[in-house]
């Protein structure tokens, strides 16, 4: 047990503080205990397992009917009304028929109602995931021999439209473009859902936390630009080939500029009117949202008016304007996704699963904190995974939590996930009765709805200057992620964001701040001598602070910083002393840190016999951990200082650092060594060092 060498005093009474050593359990014993706990079969365990998988069993019996029902019904109706036009519009992004978007919205709401732990999050179609699904669908369609420029929506698209020079993939002779497109989407969705379920079973909910907020914001920004680019041709009514792969955004805009003369005047006018109405309505809603009890369903009103105008104006027949086409009613028979396609899209499903999980967990945790309850990240993975796995057999594609609809749910009084059942009922009504009424809806109107929904993500670019002032490293992650999404691809943008995030993290720990500390007046506190004026440096003692972990990547910087600030290269000087060469001290300022990165062993450091200090105290409070290289660095440092008759002391070590020091052999086997080297505070270490020095000087004087 560790004991403080100088126990604190309280009211003149000494208080002895001893540390209870941690009881370490071996890996095999830990695995056995967890396996035994997991495999125990009893009624309470089975009940807990079922309640964990289906949280609705726990909260539904406690539902406060009078308090919650009105808000849940209202928010469910509003979200259902918003879902219908968004589902039809987002089918453009996914390259699928609108009916499949409605299926997806219906099943996702029901499954998350049963399995979700968040009371407010809305899980359903999400623009970024729709874009990622659409890119995979387009690529696989082209590989299968279908014309990539053929759109999914519109009349006559259920026919097999093939390239003249392409060879039809075996087994596709009886399956048209739309049939094969939904096969690809369901296979991709099933694989992504299986990844998410597997992550939930393995308790890997923490993995999504490695996708930082700047990364997600930059990814949303880059993906929004890509979505805007993909919808530009629908806004103008221009038919251009679908571009894939490297530089898709640039190639698409070049094709648009080359074919802008072929724009459909009817689509251009309709797009201009719809954009003006939607943007104006959104701005007014944002400005006066405190006065509106229920958000105005602008998208639905625009769709209704546009559909009526297109039908009675015969815009498709007279002006060649592209329309949604036939949207069937009812449900189709379930179908098992094609295993061959699943293997071909397995890699794409990984990025899809990671993005969907990250957005879902981050939104669930954010709204749980703001409303005073907790969510389970692992259960969220299972819930979102099941929202992908089960609906994949019913012609649905990937889903995740969506911020905009979640905000609407909260604003309209949502209290529990019962509102999702109401939303599913609204979608079901459209599926069974109202879907054919959208036959004459122009695709440019759907594109306008998608573009306007990107306002929030595109506005995040205004936050970049503030992010740069706050953290240049985070701003670099934001820019790198967004730029790679736009210039290369969505998947490459995600990888670039993760890479730069890890690089930023490594950079921050590789070169942390280092400083010499001095005493604040007569207090027991010490601060950076270069940052504050009027501090009192302890006589003949150097107090060094390193604000980061000590590990293999920064051990050299640790030594360079220490040697530069103290003016003594201990390794170089100890070697010269062993060789019998006179050593001296540098005349460099002890707090000058301008060349911390350029100081190397022996470069301009001349050390005399009188070093100006007899003890070095390292403030280990910011020292998070030590690895093998860090332990070896401390051992060598103590050895070199000892050769120069300088004492090395450590202060404010955390229990984990103390354990590492003991296991690494830094403290030795006896308790006395720890009490001589480790101190509970910087001040106690400094006072002990000064007291020991005075005792030695007194002993020398007596001799």
From Swiss-Prot:
Where in the numbering of this chain does the STAS domain appear?
A: 531-689
According to the record, which residues are glycosylated? 158, 163, 587
Phosphothreonine: residues carrying this PTM: 13
Query: Which domain of life, per UniProt?
Result: Eukaryota
Task: Give GO terms for biological process.
Answer: chloride transmembrane transport; chloride transport; oxalate transport; sulfate transmembrane transport
Could you state one GO cellular component term attached to this entry? basolateral plasma membrane
Q: Which residues carry this modification: Phosphoserine?
A: 586, 589
Q: Does the keyword Glycoprotein apply?
A: yes
Q: Cite a single GO MF annotation.
A: oxalate transmembrane transporter activity
Q: In which tissues is it expressed?
A: Expressed in kidney cortex and medulla, ileum and colon (at protein level). Expressed in liver and kidney. Less abundant in muscle and brain. Expressed in the hepatocytes and endothelial cells.
User: Catalysed reaction(s)?
Assistant: thiosulfate(in) + sulfate(out) = thiosulfate(out) + sulfate(in); 2 hydrogencarbonate(out) + sulfate(in) = 2 hydrogencarbonate(in) + sulfate(out); oxalate(in) + sulfate(out) = oxalate(out) + sulfate(in); oxalate(in) + 2 hydrogencarbonate(out) = oxalate(out) + 2 hydrogencarbonate(in)
Question: Which InterPro entries has this protein been placed in?
Answer: S04_transporter_CS, SLC26A/SulP_dom, SLC26A/SulP_fam, STAS_dom, STAS_dom_sf
A Pfam family reported for this protein in Swiss-Prot or TrEMBL:
STAS
TM region positions: 68-90, 94-116, 184-206, 260-279, 291-313, 346-368, 381-403, 416-438, 476-498
Topology versus the membrane = Multi-pass membrane protein
What keywords tag this UniProt record? Anion exchange, Antiport, Cell membrane, Glycoprotein, Ion channel, Ion transport, Membrane, Phosphoprotein, Transmembrane, Transmembrane helix, Transport
What influences the activity of this protein, per its activity regulation comment?
Answer: Inhibited by 4,4'-diisothiocyanatostilbene-2,2'-disulfonic acid (DIDS).
Where located?
Answer: Cell membrane; Basolateral cell membrane
Give the chief site where it resides.
membrane
Which positions form S-S bridges?
none
Q: Which family does it belong to?
A: Belongs to the SLC26A/SulP transporter (TC 2.A.53) family.
Function, as annotated, reads: Sodium-independent sulfate anion transporter. Can transport other anions including thiosulfate, bicarbonate and oxalate by mediating sulfate-oxalate, sulfate-bicarbonate, sulfate-thiosulfate and oxalate-bicarbonate anion exchange.
Output the PANTHER family linked to this UniProt entry.
SULFATE TRANSPORTER
Q: Return the protein name.
A: Sulfate anion transporter 1
């Amino acid at each position: 047990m560790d004991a403080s060498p100088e126990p604190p005093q309280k009211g003149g009474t000494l208080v002895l503080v001893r540390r209870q050593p941690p009881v370490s359990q071996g890996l095999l014993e830990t695995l056995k205990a967890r396996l035994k706990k997991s495999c125990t079969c009893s009624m309470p365990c089975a009940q807990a397992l079922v309640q964990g998988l289906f949280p609705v069993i726990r909260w539904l019996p406690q539902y406060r009917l009078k308090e919650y029902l009105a808000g849940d019904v209202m928010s469910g109706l509003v979200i259902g009304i918003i879902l219908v036009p968004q589902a039809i519009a987002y089918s453009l992004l996914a390259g699928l028929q609108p009916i499949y978007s409605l299926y997806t919205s219906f099943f996702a709401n029901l499954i998350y109602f049963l399995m979700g732990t968040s009371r407010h999050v809305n899980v359903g179609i999400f623009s970024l995931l729709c874009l990622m699904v659409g890119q995979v669908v387009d690529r696989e369609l082209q590989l299968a021999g279908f014309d990539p420029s053929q759109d999914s929506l519109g009349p006559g698209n259920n026919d097999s439209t093939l390239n003249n020079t392409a060879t039809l993939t075996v087994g596709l002779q009886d399956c048209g473009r739309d049939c094969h497109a939904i096969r690809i989407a369901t296979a991709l969705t099933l694989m992504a859902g299986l990844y998410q379920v597997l992550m939930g079973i393995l308790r890997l909910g923490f993995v999504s936390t490695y996708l930082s907020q700047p990364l997600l914001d930059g990814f949303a920004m880059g993906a929004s630009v890509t979505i805007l680019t993909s919808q530009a041709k629908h806004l103008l009514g221009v038919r251009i080939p679908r571009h894939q792969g490297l530089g898709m955004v640039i190639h698409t805009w070049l094709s648009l500029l080359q074919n802008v003369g072929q724009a459909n005047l009817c689509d251009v006018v309709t797009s201009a009117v719809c954009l003006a109405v939607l943007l104006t309505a959104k701005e007014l809603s944002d400005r006066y949202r405190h006065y509106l009890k229920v958000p105005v369903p602008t998208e639905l009103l625009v769709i209704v008016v546009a559909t009526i105008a297109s039908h009675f104006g015969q815009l498709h027949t007279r002006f060649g304007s592209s329309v949604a086409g036939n949207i069937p009613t009812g449900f189709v028979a379930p179908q098992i996704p094609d295993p061959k396609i699943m293997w071909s899209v397995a890699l794409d499903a990984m990025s899809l699963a990671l993005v969907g999980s990250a957005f879902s967990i981050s939104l669930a945790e954010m709204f749980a904190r703001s409303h005073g309850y907790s969510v389970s990240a692992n259960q969220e993975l299972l819930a979102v995974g099941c929202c992908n796995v089960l609906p994949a057999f019913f012609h649905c594609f990937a889903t995740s939590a969506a911020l905009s609809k979640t905000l609407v749910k909260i604003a309209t009084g949502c209290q529990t996930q019962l509102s999702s059942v109401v939303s599913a009922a609204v979608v079901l009504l459209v599926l069974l009765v109202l879907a054919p009424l959208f036959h004459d809806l122009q695709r440019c109107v759907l594109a306008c709805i998608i573009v306007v929904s990107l306002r929030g993500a595109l506005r995040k670019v205004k936050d970049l200057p503030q992010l740069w002032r706050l953290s240049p490293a985070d701003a670099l992650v934001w820019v790198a992620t967004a730029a790679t999404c736009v210039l290369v691809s969505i998947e490459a943008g995600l990888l670039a964001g993760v890479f730069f995030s890890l690089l930023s993290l490594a950079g921050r720990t590789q070169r942390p701040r280092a400083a010499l500390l001095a005493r604040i007046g007569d207090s027991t506190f010490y601060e950076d001598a270069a940052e504050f004026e009027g501090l009192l440096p302890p006589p003949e003692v150097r107090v060094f602070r390193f604000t980061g972990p000590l590990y293999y990547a920064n051990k050299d910087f640790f030594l360079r910083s220490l040697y530069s600030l103290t003016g003594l290269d201990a390794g170089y000087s100890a070697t010269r002393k062993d060789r019998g060469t006179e050593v001296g001290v540098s005349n460099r300022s002890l707090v000058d840190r301008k060349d911390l990165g350029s100081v190397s062993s022996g470069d301009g450091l001349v050390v005399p016999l009188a070093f100006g200090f007899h003890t070095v105290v390292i403030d280990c409070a910011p020292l998070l951990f030590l690895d093998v290289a860090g332990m070896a660095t401390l051992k060598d440092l103590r050895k070199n200082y000892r050769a120069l008759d300088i004492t090395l002391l450590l202060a404010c070590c955390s229990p984990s650092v103390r354990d590492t020091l003991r296991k690494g052999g830094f403290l030795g086997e006896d308790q006395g060594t720890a009490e001589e080297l480790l101190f509970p505070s910087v001040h106690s270490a400094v006072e002990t060092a000064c007291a020991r020095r005075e005792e030695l000087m007194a002993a020398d004087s007596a001799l």
